[in-house]
C-alpha cells in the first residue's frame, strides 16, 4: 500500500505589520542649517500636509531617534501611511527658503532591520 501523498499549503501574509520604520536623512544645499527634534517633526508633518491635506497630516508618526548633527532620524509610521509619507518627503524641496532633500536610507516593517547595514559590514 503506497504512503499517502504529502500535502503542502503555502501561506502568504501580506503586510501583517501595523507599523513601518524608516531611516531618513535631511540634506541641505547650504551647510550650517540646524533643526531640533521638534522642528524636524514639524517639517515632516508640513510636508505631508502640503501634499495630501490636513486629514492625512494627522497620520500617527513618531520620531524614535534623531541626531541633530547629521539631521538623520528613525521614524515609525502606520503601514497605511507609509507611501504618503515617503512621497511627501521625496517631493519636499525647501525649508524656510533653503533648498533641501530627504534621503530615505532604509525602510522595513521590522525595527531590528534598521540596526545594521549589510553593505557596511566589516568582517574580522
UniProtKB/Swiss-Prot annotation:
Main location: nucleus
Biological-process GO terms, alphabetical: tRNA 5'-leader removal
Locations listed in the record: Nucleus, Nucleolus
SUPFAM superfamilies assigned: Rnp2-like
Domain of life per record: Eukaryota
Keyword terms of this UniProt record: Nucleus, RNA-binding, tRNA processing
One cellular component term from this protein's GO annotations in UniProt: multimeric ribonuclease P complex
Gene Ontology MF terms: ribonuclease P activity; ribonuclease P RNA binding
Chain's role: Component of ribonuclease P, a ribonucleoprotein complex that generates mature tRNA molecules by cleaving their 5'-ends.
Subunit relationships: RNase P consists of a catalytic RNA moiety and about 10 protein subunits; POP1, POP4, POP5, POP7, RPP14, RPP21, RPP25, RPP30, RPP38 and RPP40. Within the RNase P complex, POP1, POP7 and RPP25 form the 'finger' subcomplex, POP5, RPP14, RPP40 and homodimeric RPP30 form the 'palm' subcomplex, and RPP21, POP4 and RPP38 form the 'wrist' subcomplex. All subunits of the RNase P complex interact with the catalytic RNA.
Protein name: Ribonuclease P protein subunit p14
Organism this protein belongs to: Homo sapiens
Amino acid at each position: 500500500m503506497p504512503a499517502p501523498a504529502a500535502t503542502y499549503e503555502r501561506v502568504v501574509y501580506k503586510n501583517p505589520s501595523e507599523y513601518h520604520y524608516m531611516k531618513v536623512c535631511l540634506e541641505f544645499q547650504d551647510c550650517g542649517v540646524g533643526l531640533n527634534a521638534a522642528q524636524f517633526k514639524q517639517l515632516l508633518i508640513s510636508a505631508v500636509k502640503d501634499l495630501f491635506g490636513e486629514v492625512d497630516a494627522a497620520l500617527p508618526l513618531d520620531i524614535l531617534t534623531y541626531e541633530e548633527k547629521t539631521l538623520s532620524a528613525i521614524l515609525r509610521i502606520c503601514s497605511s501611511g507609509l507611501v504618503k509619507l515617503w512621497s511627501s518627503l521625496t517631493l519636499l524641496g525647501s525649508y524656510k527658503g533653503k533648498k533641501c532633500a530627504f534621503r530615505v536610507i532604509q525602510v522595513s516593517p521590522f525595527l531590528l532591520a534598521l540596526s545594521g547595514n549589510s553593505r557596511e559590514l566589516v568582517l574580522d
